[in-house]
């Protein structure tokens, strides 16, 4: 949230569509792998966790066009098969957007919490791919 409020990332995070706190597992589709966050992750769909009251991403039409033109949409909410449908959008985020990059793709803001999904005992270790990938980029 601080990334949008300080304008390091475009748009805003609004209160969730149904005005409630959401805490659950979701699936996200990786939309851009040309960055240090996702470039070596083999999977295209990750199971991650969300826990927020204000996670409803919104931006202007011009900002959305710019995000698309510059390939800045990082991840979107989807189902297990990767379909980005309304039913998979937990908070009402514009076009199922779960995370975006800045233009240089060195700043990532996303609603899902990969740190909460780093062990199979937590139902998924998909979050570990995210952190392992970042570590690999520094080697």
List each model region and its residues:
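Cysteine-nucleophile active-site neighborhood
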Residues: 1-35
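C-terminal and late-domain segments of enzyme folds
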Residues: 38-139
């Amino acid at each position: 949230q601080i990334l949008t409020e300080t304008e390091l990332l475009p748009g805003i995070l609004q209160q969730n569509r149904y005005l409630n706190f959401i805490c659950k597992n979701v699936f996200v589709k990786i939309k851009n792998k040309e960055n240090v966050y996702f470039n070596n992750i083999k999977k295209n769909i990750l199971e991650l966790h969300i826990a927020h009251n204000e996670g409803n991403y919104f931006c202007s039409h011009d900002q959305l066009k710019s995000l698309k033109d510059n390939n800045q949409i990082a991840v979107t909410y989807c189902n297990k098969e990767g379909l980005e449908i309304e039913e998979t959008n937990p908070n009402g985020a514009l076009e199922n957007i779960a995370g975006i990059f800045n233009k240089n793709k060195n700043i990532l803001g996303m609603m899902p919490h990969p740190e909460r999904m780093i062990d199979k005992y937590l139902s998924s270790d998909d979050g570990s791919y995210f952190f392992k990938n970042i570590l690999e980029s520094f080697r």
